[in-house]
Amino acid sequence: MGQGIAKAFAQVDGYEVALCDIKQEWADGGKEKIKKGYARLVEKGKMTQEAVDAILAKITPGLKEDLCADCDLIVEAAFEDMGVKKTTFQELDKIAKPECIFASNTSSLSITEIGNGLTRPMVGMHFFNPAPVMKLVEVIRGENTTDEVNDKVVAIAKEIGKTPVEVKEAAGFVVNRILIPMINEAV
């Protein structure tokens, strides 16, 4: 999912993307997968190589401790494990500049709990697969999410061509809260 989110931002003018992972080779591999995906679009005539090169030039793979100090927005896309997400943001809280916005791409975990103990407000920014194509983004407000942070993330979602849906923190947020009962009914 992180690769798709990186593409969603890099495809828009004005955004530079730090594609971070816990190992440099994993981050490099993520950019390589992005590159291969775009190569297929060039082969099919859906994009020019020049356009692809411009997008790829805006994606820098690396480690959070090397790339996140100057970020304005960090969208975390680790797997759905509360401990992993909390630890990731606690580490980022020591690295990122004070005005950096922290957003989690969680599909169901508590934004409030993820953000407890941080020095800044936390917000949810839940993309849907495939992130570069799907227009919907849930913007989830936790107990400590300020109006300023919420409004900024809504504006950013619009800037990158998404349709933000603002939701309060609740189990499954909006989409999964509707989707799961529908799937259960179908089964």
Where are the predicted features?
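Buried hydrophobic positions in well-ordered alpha/beta secondary-structure cores of metabolic enzymes
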Residues: 1, 34, 59, 74-77, ...
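NAD(P)+-binding Rossmann beta1-loop-alpha1 motif at the extreme N-terminus of oxidoreductases
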Residues: 1-40
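Structural signal for hydrophobic packing residues in well-ordered secondary-structure cores
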Residues: 9, 31, 35-42, 75, ...
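Internal alpha-helical scaffold of NAD(P)-dependent oxidoreductase catalytic cores
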Residues: 14-15, 137-170, 180-187
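Rossmann-like NAD(P)-binding element
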Residues: 22-29, 40-102, 108-113
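A non-catalytic, amphipathic alpha-helix used as a structural packing/dimerization or gating element
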Residues: 25-36, 54, 84, 148-159
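Rossmann-fold NAD(P)-binding glycine/threonine-rich loop
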Residues: 81-155
